[in-house]
Regions:
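N-terminal helix-turn-helix DNA-binding core of bacterial DNA-binding proteins
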Residues: 6-46, 66, 70-79
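Short alpha-helical linear motifs
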Residues: 47-51, 90-91
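Core alpha-helical elements of the protein kinase catalytic domain
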Residues: 13, 25, 52-54, 94
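Short, isolated positions within intrinsically disordered regulatory regions of eukaryotic proteins
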Residues: 54, 73-75, 85
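Functionally engaged cysteine thiol sites
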Residues: 29, 33-36, 58, 91, ...
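Alpha-helical residues within the helix-turn-helix
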Residues: 39, 50, 56-57
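Amphipathic alpha-helical dimerization/coiled-coil segments
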Residues: 1-7, 77-100
Length: 100
């Protein structure tokens, strides 16, 4: 199968950070307020905003504002898209890139 590998780079780069991976792990339990996420880290609110922007820009996470609070959750469509891609490129197959 032919892939546009560049399409996967933003999401994979977003996940290539220890703090952002922990945030994704936390969000696997469900939607969380930014204030709850912040309680789990030794970082400032602007630093959390930086990480959340990267996760949201890559569409791994979605955010919604409720009053003055931001709530975040995993994007299930992007999650499945990444799972499918990683499963495909790591599986043994006849049309493997190395045989083309």
């Amino acid at each position: 199968m032919e892939y546009s590998y560049a399409a996967y780079v933003p999401a994979l780069k977003a996940l290539a950070d220890e703090t952002r991976l922990k945030i994704v792990d936390m969000l696997s339990c469900g939607e969380l307020c930014a204030c709850k996420i912040l309680e789990s880290f030794q970082i400032t609110q602007p630093t959390l905003s930086y990480h959340m922007k990267i996760l949201c820009d890559s569409e791994v996470v979605t955010g919604r504002r409720e009053g003055s609070w931001m709530y975040y959750r995993l994007n299930p469509d992007k999650r499945q898209w990444l799972f499918d891609f990683l499963a495909e490129i790591t599986s043994t197959k006849e049309n493997c890139i190395c045989f083309n």
